[in-house]
């Protein structure tokens, strides 16, 4: 049987709405919203970010992990 899933609202990039030009790796509270409890970076289709900001977000999270501001994973 086929389920009716309905129309989903288009997600918008929160960085574009706030007009943030640069995503800072030191802004850990904002970066934590885009990481799962296992430490994985959430994909674009779930977060709703545009491609430009998703790439910047990924680089910032990786820098933050390297500087030990964010964990690589939770054991």
Curated annotation (Swiss-Prot):
Q: Which GO terms describe its biological process?
A: translation
Role played: Binds as a heterodimer with protein bS6 to the central domain of the 16S rRNA, where it helps stabilize the platform of the 30S subunit.
Coiled-coil spans are none
Query: What Gene3D superfamilies does this protein's entry cite?
Result: Ribosomal protein S18
Species of provenance: Desulforudis audaxviator (strain MP104C)
Q: Which family does it belong to?
A: Belongs to the bacterial ribosomal protein bS18 family.
Q: Which UniProt keywords apply?
A: Ribonucleoprotein, Ribosomal protein, RNA-binding, rRNA-binding
Top-rank taxon of the source lineage equals Bacteria
Return the GO cellular component terms, semicolon-separated.
Answer: cytosolic small ribosomal subunit
Q: What is this protein called?
A: Small ribosomal subunit protein bS18
Q: Name one GO molecular function term.
A: small ribosomal subunit rRNA binding
**What is said about its interaction partners and assembly?**
Part of the 30S ribosomal subunit. Forms a tight heterodimer with protein bS6.
Question: Which positions make up the signal peptide?
Answer: none
Entry-linked Pfam families? Ribosomal_S18
């Amino acid at each position: 049987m086929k389920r009716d899933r309905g129309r989903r609202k288009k997600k918008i990039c929160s960085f574009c709405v706030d007009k943030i030009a640069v995503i800072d790796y030191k802004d850990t509270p904002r970066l934590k919203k885009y990481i799962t409890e296992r430490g994985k970076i959430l994909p674009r289709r779930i977060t709703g970010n545009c491609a430009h900001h998703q790439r910047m977000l990924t680089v910032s999270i990786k820098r933050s992990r390297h500087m030990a501001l964010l964990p690589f994973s939770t054991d």
